[in-house]
Amino acid sequence: LITANIYVLCSDGDLQEGVSAESAALAGHLGLGNLIAIYDSNQITIAGDARLAMSENVGQRFEAYGWHVQHCNGHDHDQIVQAVEAARAEGGKPSLIIAKTTIGKGSPNKQGTSDIHGSPLGDEELAATREALGWEHSERFYVPEEVREVFANRKAENIEEYEHWQELFSQWQSAHPEKAKIWNQHWEPPYGEDQL
């Protein structure tokens, strides 16, 4: 019933934090094979170039924690899919996919710099980026109809999968009432909303 993978998207800045070492070491120790972290390795943080404060080999660090580590081009969807499939097949240990990217790819004057991290492009750079990427739409926050259709179809598939899972879960609860009681206790807060 509970066969889901847990996905993490993390950045250079995230992996500089001490808590990443503690949690990654524990995940490796416990062999959390359904945990897949995709590391957007663009060597940029909000404060500037990540190499100003980070020089370790992240892949080797995670291998030392007992993780399955892969590298891919973060701009190549096929490579990402292959890496995720390999991570799911690994099963016995958590996986780190180091996806090498260029932050702001396509922005002629800001890509690869911290100027694009958490900051708007501005009208001129936005126009230059649209041109560089061959994006013919000038509307802000525009989503083409074919993209909307893809998401609408996926939403329908997700609803169908969820309803099927709910049926299986209901059958499991009926067959295992004591375990179901424990399960439900974990999803109920130990206090009421009025106590928050």
Language-model features: locations:
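Glycine-rich ThDP/TPP pyrophosphate-binding loop and its adjacent helix/strand module
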Residues: 1-153
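Thiamine diphosphate
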Residues: 1-5, 71, 148-196
